[in-house]
Amino acid sequence: MSRMAEQQLYIHGGYTSATSGRTFETINPANGNVLATVQAAGREDVDRAVKSAQQGQKIWAAMTAMERSRILRRAVDILRERNNELAKLETLDTGKAYSETSTVDIVTGADVLEYYAGLIPSLEGSQIPLRETSFVYTRREPLGVVAGIGAWNYPIQIALWKSAPALAAGNAMIFKPSEVTPLTALKLAEIYSEAGLPDGVFNVLPGVGAETGQYLTDHPGIAKVSFTGGVASGKKVMANSAASSLKEVTMELGGKSPLIVFDDADLDLAADIAMMANFFSSGQVCTNGTRVFVPAKCKAAFEQKILARVERIRAGDVFDPQTNFGPLVSFPHRDNVLRYIAKGKEEGARVLCGGDVLKGDGFDNGAWVAPTVFTDCRDEMTIVREEIFGPVMSLLTYESEDEVIRRANDTDYGLAAGIVTADLNRAHRVIHQLEAGICWINTWGESPAEMPVGGYKHSGIGRENGVMTLQSYTQVKSIQVEMAKFQSIF
C-alpha cells in the first residue's frame, strides 16, 4: 500500500489541522513501512475539542431516546457494510492478521454499539413514596463531556467499547487513540458523522499519550476519563484526573492471568484453551492467561500437546486468509518482549520452543517474535511476575488445589482467570476463590457486549460493557416533591 495522506484531527464533524505543528509517524509492523504522518493534538486543540463537544452534547442530550438510538444503529449498519475495508486498515496499522481483524475487531465493536443503542430507552429514573403528600423521583442525566484514551492492541474495538455507552447515555466523547495505532479511530469518527451524530459529539485527537492524554485528564471541562493501558500509565491518569477536577474514571489495565488445568481435564481441550489464551493476536491481549498451571504428573503430556499445536501456527503474509499469527505492534514493543525472553533464559526457565525473532523471507523487516513457551518456571521469575504482552507462555506445575489457588492469587494483578476441569463442583468452588474480575470455565477470551469486564486489584477500576457501564456514564439527580403546605420552624 502506498503512503497515506497526512492525517489530521477530527473536531466538530470534520478534519482540521493541529495547532501544535507537531507530527508523528505510524508504521506497518509487518514490514517496517511508514503508513502515514499523523498530526499531534496540543493543548489548544484539546480546548477546541472540549468547546466543540460541549456544544454538540447539548444538542445530543436534547434528542429523544429513540432518536439517539436510531443514529447509533445507523452507525452500526455502516460499520458492518465497511467491515472489510476497516479490517484491512486495522491490519496495516496493527500488524494483526486480516483473518482476525475481519472477523473480530470491527464485528465485536459493532455488536457493542448495537447493544447500547438498544439500551438507550431503558435509562429510567425511579419514584420513591415518602408519605401521602410527598415523594421523590430520580433522573439519570448525562455527565457531559467525557474522554476516552485507547490502547494500541484493539484500536477500533476499544474506541467503540468506550464511545458506545458514553454516547448512549447522552454524553459527548473526545477520544485519543494510541499514537502507535491511530488510524481507524479517525474512520470511526467519519462513520458517526455520516450516521447523523451532531457535530462535536465524537471528536478524535491523535497525539502522544504523555502530552495529549495529560491535557485531557487535566482539563476542567471533562467529567470522566475512561482509560485502557498499562498499570503505571493508568495510575498517572487517575492521579491527574482527581487532582484537576475530581473526574470519574474507568481503568482497564494490565494482567498476568492464571489458567489452571486440573488433573481431570481433557488435556486436548486444555491445550487448545492455553494456545488461545497466549497466542491469539500474537499474545497482545490484556486478559491473556500467561501463567499456565498444570498438575506435575500431567506436565510432560501437556508440553507435547502444546508443541503439537505450536506447529499449527501460521505466520506470514498478514493478508493471507490462512495466516493466524502476525508481528508485534511495533519495533520498540518487539524489543521489550525480547528483553523479557532473555530474562527468562537468564533466570533458568527452559525454552520449550521459540525464544527469538522469526527469521527468513517476509520476516526480516518486521517486528516478528516467534511463539515462545517456557517450562520449568517458578513463581518468582520475572516472566511469571510481570506482564509481557507478547507471545510468551509460562508453564508452572502444582500438587494440590489449595496450593494452586494461593499461587494464582499471588499477584498485584486481577484482570482475568480461568480453569479447565470436568468437575462442575470444583469449577465453581475454585473460580469463586480466584481474585479476578473476568473468569472463564472451560473456555477463554470471549467478552460479549452483555458481559461486564474489568479487573480486581491493580488491573483496574470500573467495568466496560454490560448494563452497569451505561449507568456509569450518568449521574443521578434526586428531586423531592411536597404537595402539602410547607411548614417552617421560623
Swiss-Prot record:
Biochemical pathway: Amine and polyamine biosynthesis; betaine biosynthesis via choline pathway; betaine from betaine aldehyde: step 1/1
Residues the record marks as active site: 162 (charge relay system), 252 (proton acceptor), 286 (nucleophile), 464 (charge relay system)
Claim: Oxidoreductase is one of the keywords in the record: yes
Protein species of origin: Escherichia coli O17:K52:H18 (strain UMN026 / ExPEC)
UniProtKB keywords: Metal-binding, NAD, NADP, Oxidation, Oxidoreductase, Potassium
Enzyme Commission number(s): 1.2.1.8
Enzyme class: oxidoreductase
Keyword NAD assigned: yes
Essential cofactor(s): K(+)
Description of how the protein assembles with itself and partners: Dimer of dimers.
Pfam families registered for this protein in UniProt: Aldedh
Site feature: Seems to be a necessary countercharge to the potassium cations: 248
Protein family according to the UniProt entry: Belongs to the aldehyde dehydrogenase family.
Entry protein name: Betaine aldehyde dehydrogenase
Domain of life per record: Bacteria
InterPro entries reported in the protein's UniProt record: Ald_DH/histidinol_DH (IPR016161), Ald_DH_C (IPR016163), Ald_DH_CS_CYS (IPR016160), Ald_DH_CS_GLU (IPR029510), Ald_DH_N (IPR016162), Aldehyde_DH_dom (IPR015590), BADH (IPR011264)
